[in-house]
Amino acid sequence: MVNQKIQLICETESAVQFTALCQQKGLIHDPDSYLALVQTKVEGQVRLELRKLDEPKLGAVYVDFVTGTMAHRRKYGGGRGEAVAKAVGIKGNYLPTVIDATAGLGRDAFVLAALGCKVRLVERHPIVHLLLQDGLKRAYADVEIGTMMQANMQLLDIAHIQELNSSEEGADVVYLDPMYPHKQKSALVKKEMRIFQHLIGADLDADMLLEPALLLAQKRAVVKRPDYADFLAKKTPHFSHQTKNHRFDIYLKT
């Protein structure tokens, strides 16, 4: 994806660094866009945010593994009982290596990394990639989780898992969570999803991810879907884990 138009706003002194980052990803400043990528400073820390300027009440979308929701989930969440942990097959001493092929904001990957899995992340949208890269940079520098994050979460500088060599760069598990149109009225959808849908839309070519995922996966491919969605690529999984709103479809390597 090249030459993505979006408002580029720098609220810090390091405008040169911000401009270089944006140029690297082919981003072009569009003063008429209602979506903005913003470099700002909060409590002394520089971070990247995505804002929907025509709906300021939505707030900003950014990646934060250190504080807030993700810190709470790491400390007090379900741990190995989390649905994503069960879906990838964590059991006893077994901690699979994982490729998260549709990393997004990195939340499911973070749950797995915090449990001890080595997770490589792929994110093809340049703006989301920058948000994720920014969040990881701050997490790597954190006193409490920095060492674990550097060891267990790595963002690859590629846009698609097809760029990986299946014989040398595979993993035990390849995890897919493609964007899917929401059924609910937009007001009921979480702010991240509302902003993301304006930025990305649904992954209309998501069906094309399953085959390369199965090539890279040494043990299983896992696909997270809304409970009302069809199977990816209309391919029936070996089995599924059902949660309140989602379904994890598991495709075993046979």
From Swiss-Prot:
Is Methyltransferase set as a keyword in this record?
yes
**Which EC number(s) does the record attach to this protein?**
2.1.1.242
Annotated Gene3D superfamilies: Vaccinia Virus protein VP39, YhiQ-like domain
Enzymatic reactions: guanosine(1516) in 16S rRNA + S-adenosyl-L-methionine = N(2)-methylguanosine(1516) in 16S rRNA + S-adenosyl-L-homocysteine + H(+)
Q: Which cysteines are joined by disulfide bonds?
A: none
Which is an annotated GO molecular function term of this record? rRNA (guanine-N2-)-methyltransferase activity
Recorded superkingdom:
Bacteria
**Where does it sit, as one GO cellular component term?**
cytoplasm
Q: What does the protein in this record do?
A: Specifically methylates the guanosine in position 1516 of 16S rRNA.
PANTHER family per the record? RIBOSOMAL RNA SMALL SUBUNIT METHYLTRANSFERASE J
Q: Which family does it belong to?
A: Belongs to the methyltransferase superfamily. RsmJ family.
- Record's protein name: Ribosomal RNA small subunit methyltransferase J
- What lineage is on file? Bacteria, Pseudomonadati, Pseudomonadota, Gammaproteobacteria, Pasteurellales
